[in-house]
Amino acid sequence: MAELEFKRPYTEVTAMVIGVQPIGEYDRRVVLLTRERGKISAFAKGARRPNSQLVAATDLFVFGTFRLYAGRDSYTLVEASVQNYFPWFRMHIEASLEGQYFCEVLEYCTRENNDEAQLLLLLYQTLRALESGKFPARLVRSIFELKTVVIEGEMREPNPQKYLPAVMAALHHIERAPIAKLYSFSLDEPAQKELAELARRCMEFAFERHTFRSLEILEVMEV
């Protein structure tokens, strides 16, 4: 009698790596922000070995399709088809820190099995905007922060009398524009500073003054 063949319950997700942690001598634990299942963690066995097929696929910012084995209590990464490595960030320290901050924010505020597709798209478009060099990094950060707060449903409308008209116009654009058209405006220096302050206040309210380590490093570098 032929033996029955049992197929493992594989799952495929479109995702970006937003967190990486070494495990033991050769393995990695990755945090994936997925289109289908929200934020999930997966173990990548042997991913730190030089000849592993998972070495490059488990770096921060990697975007693509990930094939996972769903175990009883966790996922195991089996293979990945990478669509974008975002290699530019590995050559620019400050930009890399900005990207790490974006990932840290989303790792903090997203949940497993939530619909986080909009935040995944926001992260992808934000990295592309920063990579393009068309926008000041601080403006990109402010836009990302405000749109994240909007998507999370935590936006409180500011008093328009306290801000420049250009800042209020920018805020209304951020609130209403589809993510694909989010990064399509510029501001002069005074307006950028006001927008940054508004974004800071909104983030503090939305996330209860949570400390983001990568942001602390960025702020030290900006002094």
What annotation goes with each model-predicted range?
Residues 1-28, 33-223:
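Non-catalytic alpha-helical scaffolds and adjoining flexible linkers that form interface surfaces
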